[in-house]
Amino acid sequence: MDLIGLPTLQDNYIWLLINPQHQCLIVDPGVAAPVLHYLTENRITPKAILLTHHHNDHVGGVAEIVQAYPEMPVYGPAETQGQGCTQVVADNDTLSLLGCQISIMALPGHTLGHMAYYSAPYLFCGDTLFSAGCGRLFEGSAQQMFDSLQRIIQLPDNTLVCCAHEYTESNLRFARHVLPKNREIETYQQHVTILRAKQQPTVPSTLRIEMEINPFLRCYDYDLQRNVGFPTQPNEIWRVFACLRNMKDSF
């Protein structure tokens, strides 16, 4: 399988997962034009659209793409039914597409109905997990988002984190702020700076990398707890996450 990230809008990525038969899945098409252009130029036939949540920068291109390919199914959570979804998915559902078994994961937090799609090694996680960061809490609670991230980290460490935005540089600045002595973050920040200077993407990263450099996955880290001024009991680690998310919102 080939994975293509199409940069769109200000900082979005639309993901295409392409098999050797030149068939593909489209994930979170916020706009249609770059998708339709890529499909035409490369003679690729789309077989399905996968939606993670209802925000317009993830669903805005659905109608135009379906107009060009009218028989194509659109999978998504119930919250996307008004944005072109034709097949509602729920937690622990499995899809069989392009010869892949795709597991559906409910990840509430950014929105209440947010879903992710996992087919090893690819995790299409929308706006839940970013490289070195996580999504804002527009609808869900801090505890819901913390639990969603805890679910993600149970996946294999070679999982490719196919998130929907190029936020890595700014996220790493915050990571350095709350974990200033973390050498892995410092080294990775240098790597990302070089990539962005060349206008190259920083995603997908791997879950292994994220466990090292993403403060939102390191809420058990004593240094992090001390630096944010919120040491807590093991059964209340989500409160560290809540404090961290509030800090990031105003950083």
Curated annotation (Swiss-Prot):
Coiled-coil residues: none
Keywords on record: Hydrolase, Metal-binding, Zinc
UniProt name for this protein: Hydroxyacylglutathione hydrolase
Originating species: Edwardsiella ictaluri (strain 93-146)
PANTHER family: HYDROXYACYLGLUTATHIONE HYDROLASE (PTHR43705), HYDROXYACYLGLUTATHIONE HYDROLASE GLOB (PTHR43705:SF1)
Residues reported in the UniProt entry to bind Zn(2+) 1: 53, 55, 110, 127
Enzyme class: hydrolase
Biochemical pathway: Secondary metabolite metabolism; methylglyoxal degradation; (R)-lactate from methylglyoxal: step 2/2
Transmembrane residue ranges: none
EC number(s) from the headed UniProt entry: 3.1.2.6
Residues that, per the record, bind Zn(2+) 2: 57-58, 127, 165
GO terms of biological process kind: methylglyoxal catabolic process to D-lactate via S-lactoyl-glutathione
Entry's family note: Belongs to the metallo-beta-lactamase superfamily. Glyoxalase II family.
Function, in words: Thiolesterase that catalyzes the hydrolysis of S-D-lactoyl-glutathione to form glutathione and D-lactic acid.
Record field: catalytic activity: an S-(2-hydroxyacyl)glutathione + H2O = a 2-hydroxy carboxylate + glutathione + H(+)
Molecular-function GO terms, alphabetical: hydroxyacylglutathione hydrolase activity; metal ion binding
Listed InterPro entries: Clx_II_MBL, Glyoxalase_II_hydrolase, HAGH_C, Hydroxyacylglutathione_Hdrlase, Metallo-B-lactamas, RibonucZ/Hydroxyglut_hydro
Pfam families according to UniProt: HAGH_C (PF16123), Lactamase_B (PF00753)
Cofactor note: Binds 2 Zn(2+) ions per subunit.
